[in-house]
Amino acid sequence: MSIRLENLSYTPGARKEKHRKGRGHAAGKGKQAGRGQSGQKKRSTVRLGFEGGQNPWFRRVPKRGFRNFNKKEYEIFNISDLESRYQDGDTVSLESLYLKKVLKKRNMKAKLLANGDLTKKLTVTTNAFSIAAQKKIEEKGGKIEVR
């Protein structure tokens, strides 16, 4: 007899059937199915956070705080950052701030704060600014534009 595709088969004993536990005495692993005696660990699982009847962590610890979904987040930069990176009469935009590595993220909103001194006339375009920063820029003849 020659070996052909339709004649191929496994060697007897090479492949073993998966043992199906808990399918009756005749199957060899019926009744307790290798799980020991009856109790909580024999059954399925306990729910997440269950501590065996002890008052669980999420009920022991008090509720605290909340997350404000309407909060506006700004990346802040100061007048001192502008002083060191721009020339007199320059226009400061969010894109130029990003390219000069003042802002870390390109599409984030930015707010100008008044830390530092300004000696140059600048036109600044930003999303938000402090009143003190506005005064410092306008004292030197500059402008602030809100984007």
Curated annotation (Swiss-Prot):
InterPro entries with a match to the protein in the record? Ribosomal_uL15 (IPR030878), Ribosomal_uL15/eL18 (IPR021131), Ribosomal_uL15/eL18_sf (IPR036227), Ribosomal_uL15_bac-type (IPR005749), Ribosomal_uL15_CS (IPR001196)
Its GO biological process terms?
A: translation
Q: Supply the Pfam families for this chain.
A: Ribosomal_L27A
Q: Which residues form a coiled coil?
A: none
Q: Which PROSITE patterns does the record match to this protein?
A: RIBOSOMAL_L15
The record's GO molecular-function terms, alphabetically, read: rRNA binding; structural constituent of ribosome
Instruction: List the residue ranges of the region (Disordered).
Output: 1-46
UniProt GO cellular component terms: cytosolic large ribosomal subunit
- Which branch of life, at top level? Bacteria
Going by the UniProt record, its keywords in alphabetical order are:
Ribonucleoprotein, Ribosomal protein, RNA-binding, rRNA-binding
The Basic residues compositionally biased stretches are 16-28
Query: What parts of the sequence cross the membrane?
Result: none
Identify its protein family: Belongs to the universal ribosomal protein uL15 family.
Q: What does this protein do?
A: Binds to the 23S rRNA.
Note the subunit structure. Answer: Part of the 50S ribosomal subunit.
Record's protein name: Large ribosomal subunit protein uL15
Q: Which organism is it from?
A: Mesomycoplasma hyopneumoniae (strain J / ATCC 25934 / NCTC 10110)
Gene that produces this protein = rplO
